[in-house]
UniProtKB/Swiss-Prot annotation:
Name the UniProt record assigns to this protein: COP9 signalosome complex subunit 5
Chain's gene name: CSN5
A molecular-function term among this protein's GO annotations: metallopeptidase activity
UniProtKB keywords: Cytoplasm, Developmental protein, Differentiation, Hydrolase, Metal-binding, Metalloprotease, Nucleus, Oogenesis, Phosphoprotein, Protease, Signalosome, Zinc
Presence of the UniProt keyword Metal-binding in the record: yes
Cross-referenced Pfam families: CSN5_C, JAB
Protein's organism: Drosophila melanogaster (Fruit fly)
Reported impact of G146D: In csn5-2; disrupts R cell projections
Amino acid sequence: MDSDAAQKTWELENNIQTLPSCDEIFRYDAEQQRQIIDAKPWEKDPHFFKDIKISALALLKMVMHARSGGTLEVMGLMLGKVEDNTMIVMDAFALPVEGTETRVNAQAQAYEYMTAYMEAAKEVGRMEHAVGWYHSHPGYGCWLSGIDVSTQMLNQTYQEPFVAIVVDPVRTVSAGKVCLGAFRTYPKGYKPPNEEPSEYQTIPLNKIEDFGVHCKQYYPLEISYFKSALDRRLLDSLWNKYWVNTLGSSGLLTNTEYTTGQIMDLSEKLEQSENFLGRGTDVNEKRSEDKLSKATRDCSRSTIELIHGLMAQIVKDKLFNKVGLGK
């Protein structure tokens, strides 16, 4: 598989739609945006924004930035606009922040950089405003922690309209679907109606409590991706860099710590389920069955990820080492 084929596969897996350059989505109407911001329709409906459209260029920038951080969280800002109930992300840029394995903190340097970048963007004709922030959760899924919820609530108070995006670079498989989630928080005191459960995702045992406490304070947006013919050269340039890194690395070796952590986490979950089984009450048995079911799904997902990594290594071995060519 060459670079072009891999790029097309990536675009198909993530359902990236190609739009004509003259499409309305690429035009920025300053007056229209000002009217929307003045009207503030999101204040009347906490669930006002339902969808988010992300350009393929912004998507690849965010994924590459998140991947470069390794096991440390990274953070960046997104530029775009709003249209009806949809938020549109046109571009994204990284911020110089201090990241750890569990949180990311923006300091004065990051705010100065942010201001300078926004001013420079306007000088070259990019009039879009900041419409959200993104950060990474290396290896533990796309959701908002307690700190993330507080940060997003603050942003929605003073910088509306604003969205939070979470990228998991470890779970994002080469030439596969990007592990990404977009969220908005509810106002304080608001009780959301019972919603359908979102797509299941593996949450490490040491993160489950943080996830469970705050999961009702925000809601996910439906995500779609788009690109234009004008994006092609920029996307090609970024993809070539990404593709070389992909060929030169192994998911099995790069994610060794993540895989080991997953196995240890599964072991703890199974042990916890076993403890509930011995208590005898119907409530505990039901809870244990639920925990066992989730542990089984986590185990299946981990196995599939390992098989994909092994298959990728076999394909690269056949392509570049020419195993069996002389037979």
